[in-house]
Design a protein with these regions (language model features):
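Conserved SAM-binding loop
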Residues: 58
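Post-Walker A helix-loop "phosphate-sensing" segment adjacent to the P-loop in P-loop NTPases
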Residues: 17-22
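Conserved SAM/SAH-binding beta-strand->alpha-helix loop
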Residues: 51
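Class I SAM-dependent methyltransferase "Motif I" SAM/SAH-binding loop
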Residues: 1-5
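Surface-exposed acidic, glycine/proline-enriched linker/cap segments
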Residues: 24-40
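Conserved SAM-binding strand-loop segment of SAM-dependent methyltransferases
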Residues: 90-95
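Signature of N6-adenine DNA methyltransferases within the class I
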Residues: 9, 16, 55, 63, ...
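Conserved SAM-binding motif I beta-strand of class I
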Residues: 45-48
Length: 280
C-alpha cells in the first residue's frame, strides 16, 4: 500500500543526501580528486499499490525526485548525473498487497538486506468491507480468531513471513490497538513463533494530517527483525530506552503475552459479567 510513493520518495532523497555527504567526506579525508557518481538507483525501490492512478503518480514522483537529487548532486559535487533519456523508475506494482506474494514483487535471498516500511490502512474488524474481510481470510485464515484482528495485521504477518530467516527488516506506522487488549495474543504469538522479534518501537503518539475533520488516531511505529542479540530501543516522546527485548505491549525486557481467560483467576474474587469494553 505505497500510495503515491511518499515513503519511497522521502527514503530515496535521504539516502541520496547521505551519499553526497559520504562523497564529500571521502574527498576531504583522502585529499584526492575523485569523480563521484551516484550509487543509489530508483531500481532499488519497490512498492505495491491497489489504485492504478496512485501507481502512476508514484512512478512519476520518483522520477522527479531523482531529477531533484541529481541537481543537488551537481551543486555539491560539480558532477551532473545523466537523467535523460528516462531510465527505469522504481518497481511499482499495481495489485493487492494483501494477496500478492511479496517475494515475487521483490525477490530476495537470505543474505540480501531488504527494508520494508509503510503506513498501511488501519481498519478495525467492524469497519472492514466484504473485500477487506476476504483479504484477511486469505492472509490470516490460519490465525486463531483472525476475524477480530485489525486490517493492518495482514501487513505485519506478510512482512514477518518475508523477512523470516534473512537479514531483511520491516517497520510500519500502525494503529496502537495491535499492541493492546486481546489483539496482542492473536497477532503477536504467531509472529514470535516465527522467530521474529520487535527491533524498535515508538510508543503511542497522536497522528495528525491536513484533512478536514480528520479523526484523532493514536499510532505506534513497530520494527520487526529476526531474533538477535542486538540492543533494542523504545522511543517515547523525546526519551529513548535501550533494552534487550521489547514486548508486544511495547514495554522493555520481556516478551510475555497475556492471553484471555474465560474464568476468574481466583475463587476469592467474584465472577466478571462483562469485560472492560465500553458499551451501552
Amino acid at each position: 500500500a505505497c500510495g503515491s510513493g511518499n515513503f519511497l520518495i522521502i527514503t530515496y532523497k535521504r539516502l541520496r543526501e547521505l551519499e553526497i555527504r559520504i562523497w564529500k567526506a571521502m574527498r576531504e579525508i583522502t585529499n584526492v580528486a575523485m569523480l563521484p557518481f551516484p550509487n543509489i538507483s530508483l531500481t532499488q525501490f519497490y512498492g505495491i499499490e491497489l489504485d492504478e492512478y496512485a501507481c502512476d503518480t508514484a512512478t512519476l514522483s520518483l522520477w522527479l525526485a531523482e531529477h531533484q537529487m541529481n541537481v543537488k548532486f551537481q551543486e555539491e559535487l560539480y558532477v551532473l548525473p545523466e537523467t535523460l533519456p528516462l531510465k527505469p523508475s522504481g518497481h511499482i506494482v499495481c495489485g493487492n498487497a494483501c494477496r500478492l506474494d511479496w517475494n515475487t514483487v521483490c525477490p530476495h535471498t537470505p543474505e540480501d538486506e531488504v527494508y520494508i516500511m509503510g503506513n498501511p490502512p488501519y481498519l478495525g474488524s467492524s469497519m472492514q468491507n466484504k473485500e477487506q474481510k476476504e483479504d484477511k481470510a486469505i492472509a490470516l485464515g490460519h490465525f486463531k480468531s483472525y476475524k477480530d484482528l485489525d486490517y493492518i495485521s495482514i501487513w505485519f504477518y506478510k512482512a514477518a513471513e518475508y523477512i523470516k530467516d534473512s537479514h531483511s527488516k520491516a517497520a510500519f506506522v500502525s494503529t496502537n490497538s495491535i499492541c493492546q487488549g486481546e489483539q496482542v495474543a492473536m497477532l503477536w504469538a504467531p509472529l514470535f513463533a516465527m522467530n521474529i522479534e520487535i527491533s524498535f518501537a515508538v510508543t503511542s503518539f497522536k497522528w495528525s494530517n491536513n484533512a478536514k475533520h480528520a479523526a484523532a488516531v493514536f499510532c505506534v511505529i513497530v520494527g520487526l527483525q529476526n531474533k538477535s542479540n542486538s540492543s533494542k530501543y523504545i522511543i517515547s516522546g523525546k526519551s529513548r530506552t535501550q533494552t534487550n527485548a521489547i514486548s508486544c505491549y511495547l514495554t522493555p525486557e520481556t516478551t510475555e503475552i497475556i492471553d484471555k481467560k474465560s474464568d476468574r483467576i481466583s475463587s476469592f474474587v467474584p465472577k466478571m459479567v462483562r469485560g472492560s469494553m465500553a458499551s451501552d
